[in-house]
Amino acid sequence: MVDILAIGAHPDDIELSCSGTLFKQIKKGYSVGLLDLCRGELGTRGTPELRIQEANAAAEILGAGFRWNAELQDGFMNAFDRDAVCQVATFIRRAKPSVVIANAPEDRHPDHGRAADIAREACFIAGLKALDLKWEGKSLAPSRPHILLHYIQDRHLVPDIVVDISEFLDKKIEVVKAFKSQFYDPDSTEPETPISSKDFMDQLTGKAQTYGRYCGVAYGEGFILNRPAGIDNINELF
């Protein structure tokens, strides 16, 4: 159904961490779908309903084929929850991606690492023939992504690969700002958060510059591989 499925624990995780890469892949002709694991109901700013509206607006800006929500519990999702893992595996079988991009394996917010674990478990069991997963009463055929990548979030992690997003930094900032409730607003009466400061967008740009330096480009997004990557031609690396 799609070439790439991006998974985020919360609405805005995807946009903050890998939207430049998604813009780039869409321009190359690849199809992209989005899966949020929860509605962000424990978030400090905004409401779950508003965040869903913002998420849908962001998906439209990005050009995603769909945006689904698994409606897991914000703050309490974990890979030991069979139902949660099977639910995400069901979405993977529906989408049939060859590439899944998911949360950082460790980060400031505990949900991010747990979402990474859920994605890893779900990618595996989605390919098990003996596991019957249904959607709207119909069994879904097994489907296992070929590649699982983890994007990098609040905490700095050393990337295994970096994608050059120099052409798409402005689009990344635009799609991030679709989540208006979460970021700086001088008229807001809601509490401050780590991402609502006036200089946060500058910090986001600085992070992209840092990862860009790894491969000699202006701006980049870093990713961690779930397993060693195989290549056909070392001369094509840059």
Located regions from the model:
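Active-site rim/loop-helix segments in enzyme catalytic domains that contact anionic ligands
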Residues: 1-95, 235-237
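Metal-dependent de-N-acetylase/amidase catalytic core
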Residues: 1-5, 80-238
